[in-house]
């Protein structure tokens, strides 16, 4: 009502529809209402008395906390976290290694000193460097994560654990637009791999 930027016309019977809910008191229809996430894995592990450790660099803070915990910011009982500061650079192609190596060292130390039932690690590099569209930096980012994830998998295997390596979406596997030849800077919709690495055979359901 207090808007004075320009004269507005009243349009009768205007049906406003949004893709998602922005504010509960907006008088609009929502195509995809927010779905309450129940029994996220972190909560199930907590209810079973499991110890869990979530780790990422700060650029992906929300992915191992709020998102993974089903839209809950607080930790569940038995959960601990480690956040490694992301580098202060204008764009991550300037430092494609980001903080993967110190993050890895922190998780390796955790593996040595604790007996957690579940460890969650997020590597930001393939996504964040992929968004820059700089091919050479994307290659370096993937090489760094390959090295770091390899060290973690080896340590988990040595401890008799099972490692699951996957992603929530693609990005840096396509750094060049095939049609235009221009840099490709956004997420892809291609299937992602899921590797289960351990000494036993696992029948996934």
Label the model's feature ranges.
Residues 1-205:
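Feature captures the catalytic ectodomains and active-site-proximal regions of enzymes
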């Amino acid at each position: 009502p207090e808007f004075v930027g320009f004269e507005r016309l009243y349009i009768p019977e205007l049906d406003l529809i949004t893709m998602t809910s922005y504010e509960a008191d907006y008088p609009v229809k929502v195509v995809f209402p927010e779905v309450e996430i129940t029994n996220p894995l972190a909560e199930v592990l907590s209810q079973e008395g499991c110890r869990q450790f979530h780790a990422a660099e700060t650029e992906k803070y929300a992915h191992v906390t709020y998102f993974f915990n089903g839209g809950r910011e607080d930790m569940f009982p038995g959960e601990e976290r480690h956040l490694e500061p992301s580098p202060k650079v204008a764009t991550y192609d300037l430092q494609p290694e980001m903080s993967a190596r110190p993050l890895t060292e922190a998780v390796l130390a955790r593996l040595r000193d604790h007996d957690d039932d579940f460890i969650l690690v997020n590597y930001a590099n393939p996504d964040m460097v992929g968004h820059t569209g700089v091919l050479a930096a994307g290659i370096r980012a993937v090489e760094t994560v390959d090295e770091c994830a390899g060290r973690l998998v080896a340590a988990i295997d040595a401890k008799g654990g099972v490692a699951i390596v996957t992603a929530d979406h693609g990005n840096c596997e396509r750094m060049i637009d095939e049609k235009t030849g221009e840099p490709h800077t956004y997420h892809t919709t291609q299937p992602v791999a899921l590797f289960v690495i351990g000494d036993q055979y696992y029948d996934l359901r």
